[in-house]
C-alpha cells in the first residue's frame, strides 16, 4: 500500500504548478493521512479544497487565505459544490494570525508561499509584504504557522507541508524541518510531489514533509 501511494502521488500530481495543487494528489493525501477536520493553512487557488470535497473520509475543511481576490474565488467554489453537504469554513487572514481551537484538527496540510516567489497579490496581508526579509518571514510567518498547527492538531495526527527551496532562496526546506522539530513535531517521512516534465529533462519533484504530533 505504501509503494502504491507513492507511485500514485507521482502520477496524480501531474504537471500543475505548485500554486495550483492538483486535486487528485490532495485527495490521495487526505485519504491516507486525514480525518474529519482539515486545516489548509494557505488555500491558494483551491486545489486542496477540491481534493477535500472529493475525498471519502473528510467532513470539515478550514482554510485561511489572505488574498481578497483568491478568497472571493474560493467562496464561489464553496457555493458551487455546496450540494456535496461538506462543511467548509474559509477565513480571510494569514495562517500566522489564525488561532485554532486546541486539539481540534485531524490534519494540517498545505503548500505555503515560498517567501516572495509566489505573489498572489500585493496586499498588506501577504506574508512577503508583512515580513519582507528572510529572517522576518521565517519567524513571523513560517514559525507562527507551524506553531498554530501544533496547537490545533490532535495527538498523533499529521502536518504535511509541500514547500521547496528556490534558485534564489536555499533556506526554505531546512528551516521548515528545523522549526517543526523544535516545536515538538516528529518528522516521519518525506514524499515526492511531481510538478512538471521538461522536454528531455524528465520530471521535476518537490518534497512534501510529513510530521506527526506525538502524544503528550
Give the ranges of each region predicted by the language model.
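Class I S-adenosyl-L-methionine-dependent methyltransferase catalytic core
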Residues: 1-216
Amino acid at each position: 500500500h505504501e509503494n502504491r501511494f507513492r507511485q500514485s502521488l507521482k502520477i496524480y500530481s501531474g504537471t500543475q504548478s505548485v500554486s495550483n495543487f492538483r486535486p487528485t494528489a490532495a485527495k490521495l493525501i487526505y485519504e491516507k493521512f486525514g480525518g474529519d477536520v482539515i486545516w489548509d493553512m494557505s488555500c491558494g487557488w483551491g486545489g486542496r479544497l477540491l481534493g477535500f470535497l472529493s475525498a471519502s473520509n473528510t467532513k470539515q475543511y478550514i482554510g485561511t487565505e489572505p488574498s481578497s481576490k483568491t478568497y472571493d474565488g474560493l467562496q464561489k467554489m464553496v457555493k458551487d459544490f455546496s450540494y456535496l453537504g461538506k462543511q467548509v469554513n474559509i477565513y480571510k487572514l494569514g495562517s500566522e494570525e489564525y488561532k485554532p481551537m486546541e486539539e481540534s484538527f485531524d490534519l494540517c496540510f498545505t503548500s505555503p508561499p515560498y517567501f516572495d516567489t509566489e505573489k498572489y497579490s500585493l496586499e498588506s496581508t501577504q506574508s512577503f509584504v508583512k515580513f519582507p526579509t528572510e529572517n522576518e518571514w521565517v519567524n513571523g510567518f513560517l514559525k507562527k504557522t507551524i506553531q498554530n498547527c501544533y496547537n490545533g492538531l490532535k495527538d498523533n495526527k499529521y502536518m504535511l507541508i509541500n514547500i521547496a527551496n528556490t534558485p534564489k532562496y536555499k533556506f526554505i526546506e531546512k528551516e521548515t524541518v528545523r522549526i517543526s522539530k523544535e516545536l515538538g513535531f516528529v518528522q516521519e517521512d518525506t514524499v515526492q510531489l511531481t510538478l512538471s516534465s521538461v522536454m528531455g529533462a524528465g520530471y521535476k519533484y518537490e518534497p512534501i514533509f510529513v510530521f506527526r504530533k506525538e502524544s503528550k
